[in-house]
């Protein structure tokens, strides 16, 4: 039995759940968690076998995701994927749109007033295609960050609640781009700076290799 890319989505667990959590995690032969903070949680329970692995999205090559990212769009646009109707995201999208002359595309149930185009009730092929073809991505979604990294997009992730931020904070910090997680006091000039993927990719590729090896190792366990 093993876990791959399990997520606590928090930095701590309350005392009332520690005994139960420990008893269940101890039954696993290997424990791969999505956040460094998750590794610490498991170690604090007295279990030493937890390691940090990447979200499964990263286990496929960009070219494999291209097989579903087949939709094309004729305009240059900012992609906004917002769970919370964030005023920070709205202000940021408007500001970048004005500076760059890009349209604003959103993924929402209802079209925000500031959006030029809205996509709803669409499937994964539309989501991945929108990230792939965007000039810039603004979101508070972990997987918007993940696919932005896959396609080497310039992006920012806007703070939600601290516990939800954990997985995004840990991932971005581990790739030396922790400044891509922003709050209401953002600096627009820093936000629109291009991400240096020449620095990011070697770190990310090393983590991908480690994550794949973790899977190979656990699949070779004989019971």
Regions found by a protein language model. Name each.
Residues 1-223:
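Active-site anion-handling motifs in enzyme catalytic cores
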